[in-house]
A protein has these predicted regions:
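Bacterial N-terminal signal peptides
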Residues: 9-19
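Bacterial Sec-exported substrate-binding components of ABC uptake systems
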Residues: 11, 22-59
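Extracytoplasmic substrate-binding proteins
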Residues: 27-30, 120, 130-168
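Solvent-exposed, polar/charged alpha-helical surfaces in well-ordered, non-transmembrane soluble domains
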Residues: 45, 56, 66, 111-115, ...
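A short, structured surface patch at a secondary-structure boundary
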Residues: 49-50, 55-115, 120-126
Length: 168
């Protein structure tokens, strides 16, 4: 079938290249709730979640917990221990997600965030505002940050945040 010894190698190389190109999703642009245009590859597979774990897990559905590589866990485990226990019982992998600290008590760590190598960071609007001085480090590392907002308590923000989570 292959008369020239390099023909087989060339065909194999082309197959690998085509396969790789099919898997590499081109970046898309999404608009977060602050009106910021954010470019990222979808679906994100290594997510850091700053807040709204119940909302994220409800929208992300099956497999959503496996995509989390870091969270602000301390406040959730302390303020809602019974709910946290139920989540861990149904999705045991959540117990292994690293705690990156809490923005409210200024323990959130950009270093820990960078160390888990996320391809997306999802923050609440208030977290984004509080971390404004530190976020350029994520941008310099090529890590997109998307802002959602359920604290506004408006239908518009809830819908925008939920639709955005569904895209990510």
């Amino acid at each position: 079938m292959f008369r020239h010894p390099l023909a087989k190698l060339l065909l194999l190389g082309q197959l690998v290249l085509v396969s790789w190109m099919a898997q590499a999703a081109p970046p898309v642009e999404v608009e977060d709730v602050m009106g910021r245009k954010v470019s990222l590859s979808l679906p994100a597979s290594r997510i850091v979640l700053g807040f709204y774990p119940e909302d994220y897990l409800a929208v992300a559905g099956e497999g959503g917990a496996e995509r989390l590589v870091g969270m602000s866990l301390g406040w959730f485990m302390k303020s809602r221990p019974a709910i946290w226990s139920l989540y861990v019982a149904s999705q045991p992998q959540l117990a292994k997600v690293p705690d990156l600290g809490n923005v409210q008590d200024q323990s959130f760590s950009i270093e820990k965030t960078l160390a888990v190598k996320p391809d997306l960071v999802i923050l609440a609007k208030w977290q984004y505002e509080a971390l404004a001085a530190d976020l350029p480090r994520l941008e310099q590392a090529g890590i997109p940050v998307v802002v959602i907002d359920y604290n506004a308590q408006t239908l518009t923000q809830h819908m925008a945040s939920t639709l955005l989570l569904g895209k990510l």
